[in-house]
Amino acid sequence: MATPRTLVPILPPVAALLLLLVAASSIPILAAAQPADACGGAPDQAAADGACHDVPRALRLKLIAIPTILVSSVVGVCLPLLSRSVPALRPDGGLFAVVKAFASGVILATGYMHVLPDAFNNLTSPCLPRKPWSEFPFAAFVAMLAAVSTLMADSLMLTYYNRSKPRPSSGGDVAAVADHGESPDQGHRHGHGHGHGHGMAVAKPDDVEATQVQLRRNRVVVQVLEIGIVVHSVVIGLGMGASQNVCTIRPLVAAMCFHQMFEGMGLGGCILQAEYGRRMRSVLVFFFSTTTPFGIALGLALTRVYRDNSPTALIVVGLLNAASAGLLHYMALVELLAADFMGPKLQGNVRLQLAAFLAVLLGAGGMSVMAKWA
């Protein structure tokens, strides 16, 4: 008889390895960036002539930013994971749906208002040759390809889960699989499942199947969303770490704390619904929380080598930003917002649906305002 342990997929460790490769691959690529500015000057040249260019103050701000952003990330992603102890914040509650909608709005605005504009700025920079970069909208094209590729990966990963899952063949199996959480000790471990159940109802096979399909889908969402977040977090951290512009770094720290906290809440809600074990939750929390501080530290280490307006850096960072934007757009609209708003919880409660819409607008609006400084 298959227990819920057999339903733990093989792909999460692979996804974790991909996250490591994404972060590590940026080191040789960005270290190869040209030390000389192709535009004929040093980066942050406008600030270099004024009070904004202050290397010691910039270093202090960046050293403060690393633990501050780390703590904000940990708090944001862990709040939903600790919500089971608070009845009002449990995943089946209305407040959880509203908070998740707010966080989804933050993720949506991150893609549209922060990451995609940066990609356009990178790939249309005057530091790049006019041909082909100014003659074709590469940022939009790569974002579109990334969204379609995310759909393809989402579909293929879900197919993998569905084909590799065990199928319950008896009432006892149904009762065992009905408990799809992390602990196989719960539910009918004795496997009788005759329906009298000592007051416990045995789930119907169709209900169990639907529950398991949704669980597998939630796990796919977590993996794909985390990859997109990691990519743009490393890029943002790298830019902050390499900059010597105090006027840019100071507001960026505050904006990144806001961004990481609420983006973490969205990711944490998805992790909670995916019902991963403690080890996998820890891995996902670790990668989300440390990627931006890692990017800042990487930027500090490459300050003398990395030039953010060299052609190599502009192309690499611009393409990564465009791909990340397409992924975030798809995940926010399709997997998070559409899935929740078309689901039975919000469809069955108009008041809750309106509250969730308002939360999306507030989250997206707040993150859009942050685009003025970051």
UniProtKB/Swiss-Prot annotation:
Q: Under which name does UniProt file this protein?
A: Fe(2+) transport protein 1
Function of this protein?
Iron transporter involved in the uptake of iron from the rhizosphere across the plasma membrane in the root epidermal layer. May also transport other divalent cations.
Supply the gene name: IRT1
Regarding tissue, the record states: Expressed in companion cells in the upper region of the root.
- Biased composition (Basic and acidic residues) is annotated at 179-188
List where the protein spans the membrane.
63-83, 93-113, 138-158, 220-240, 252-272, 283-303, 314-334, 354-374
Q: Where is this protein localized, as stated in its record?
A: Cell membrane
Name the principal localization, coarsely classed: membrane
- Gene Ontology biological process: cadmium ion transport; iron ion transport; zinc ion transmembrane transport; zinc ion transport
Stretches for region Disordered: 166-199
UniProt topology in membrane: Multi-pass membrane protein
